[in-house]
């Protein structure tokens, strides 16, 4: 499971958070859930088009009623901003034309790009496009990441490696990369290298260490709590049905059959009338 699933979606709410934050319950055209998802994809494609040299790590989108906030995390903010902010103004204008709303553009710098999985994958892909041996490019990226403080890294390349006729995939791993551990802080990145032999996909997993129990408790406290069974409004509480009356654990007192007078200390009871085997009353 952990080997196949996307590490971000696998750890949502534990070590990762959504990169698109908005709410949609309207049925109007342009405000539906599908419309917002399509618009987010278009925004991210616009950011990646023509911005390869900027080293964009991720794009976060947050929506309000009449405004869209776009946070661009980049290793080279100067390229995104441009001279006197000309490039940033151009991006903001295109985003407002795409969304039809006021756009707040924030450009954030990635402090340590050597341990960012998306930037590492992009660096390996650029070397493959420059005809560097895929094994050399993978090992160079791994060594740089491990020297920068990462606890583990795994790099995988798939495609016509080395110009071979048959496509295959190879990966190298250094350190520890626990993909099944949910508390593990795993960063994941993917990038495609366009070579003369076709496209080669590059995937990178970087392990930054486990989050502490204190951080895990804080993240769980911040997450919305699921309603309990007795708090649900769609069905009544059925707890009273399951409760049973307490049983008397004292030994039963044998009833005395009154033949003439009741024994001392006990009340007189009615005589027990039974039937014999022939049907006559005793």
UniProtKB/Swiss-Prot annotation:
Q: Which GO terms describe its biological process?
A: translation
**Keywords, A to Z?**
Ribonucleoprotein, Ribosomal protein, RNA-binding, rRNA-binding
* KH type-2 domain location: 43-111
Disordered: annotated segments: 217-282
Alphabetized Pfam families for the sequence? KH_2, Ribosomal_S3_C
Q: Which cysteines are joined by disulfide bonds?
A: none
Q: Name one GO molecular function term.
A: rRNA binding
- What cellular component terms from Gene Ontology apply here? cytosolic small ribosomal subunit
Q: Which CDD domains match?
A: KH-II_30S_S3
Output compositional bias ranges, type Basic and acidic residues. 228-240
Q: Where is the composition biased (Low complexity)?
A: 256-269
Q: Which PROSITE patterns match?
A: KH_TYPE_2 (PS50823), RIBOSOMAL_S3 (PS00548)
Q: Per its UniProt record, what InterPro entries does this chain match?
A: KH_dom, KH_dom-like_a/b, KH_dom_type_2, KH_sf_prok-type, Ribosomal_S3_C_sf, Ribosomal_uS3_bac-typ, Ribosomal_uS3_C, Ribosomal_uS3_CS
Similarity annotation: Belongs to the universal ribosomal protein uS3 family.
- Spell out the NCBIfam families in the cross-references: rpsC_bact
Function (record text): Binds the lower part of the 30S subunit head. Binds mRNA in the 70S ribosome, positioning it for translation.
Subunit structure of this chain's protein: Part of the 30S ribosomal subunit. Forms a tight complex with proteins S10 and S14.
Write down the HAMAP family for this protein, in alphabetical order: Ribosomal_uS3_B (MF_01309_B)
| Protein name from the UniProt record | Small ribosomal subunit protein uS3
Q: What is the lineage of its organism?
A: Bacteria, Bacillati, Actinomycetota, Actinomycetes, Kineosporiales
